[in-house]
Regions:
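Short beta-to-alpha linker loops that shape the active-site pocket of alpha/beta-hydrolase fold enzymes
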Residues: 112-116
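Short beta-strand element of the alpha/beta-hydrolase
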Residues: 74-83
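Structural signature of beta-strand start/N-cap positions in the alpha/beta core
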Residues: 76, 105-107, 148
Length: 171
């Protein structure tokens, strides 16, 4: 299978550094290793503006990052990162979010939902749905007043995006 240069570089670096299998590590260690891997990757486009904020959820709050492209945005995208429900955060996925903002011409709001095992199901789903509701009601804060709203994600985040879209349709 053909892999792009960034993926090939990341895999070579992991092999060279003998990166452990994340599934064999306790969650805290897996999170640290995953973050180290991501810090070694090239950053995303720097012409994308970044602003962090807090979203209230179920008596707590979660972080979110608003990424605004230099060009005029055509949509407001809420993005849920992957990580097997256990690892990953908006810092680890910053480059991904920046690329999405630029290439999709979207204001991207990355949501740092709470993760297992500390926060088991349905906490991540509820966090993401609360984030969707908050972002929709506070479009002026995130900069997407008149833009169509879409949800997206990768891996566990793709699952969350699907569940949230269905729940929003049904409620």
């Amino acid at each position: 299978m053909h892999l792009d240069l960034a993926t090939t570089s990341m895999l070579a670096g992991m092999a060279l550094n003998e990166t452990p299998d994340l599934s064999t590590l306790p969650p805290d260690e897996a999170r640290l290793v995953f973050s180290e891997i991501n810090r070694s990757m090239p950053p995303g486009p720097q012409n994308v503006a970044s602003n962090d904020l807090e979203i209230p959820v179920d008596g707590a709050s979660i972080r979110a990052r608003v990424l605004t492209p230099a060009a005029s945005a055509k949509r407001l995208m809420i993005y849920f990162h992957g990580g097997g429900w256990v690892i990953g955060n908006i810092d680890d996925y910053d480059a991904v979010g920046r690329h999405l903002a630029e290439t999709c011409q979207s204001v991207v709001v990355m949501v740092d939902y709470r993760k297992a095992p500390e926060h088991p199901f349905p906490t991540p789903v509820n966090d993401c749905y609360s984030a969707l509701e908050w972002i929709d009601k506070n479009r002026s804060i995130v900069g997407g007043d008149a833009l169509p709203l879409v949800v997206a994600g990768d891996s566990a985040g793709g699952n969350l995006a699907t569940v949230i879209a269905i729940r929003a349709r049904d409620e």
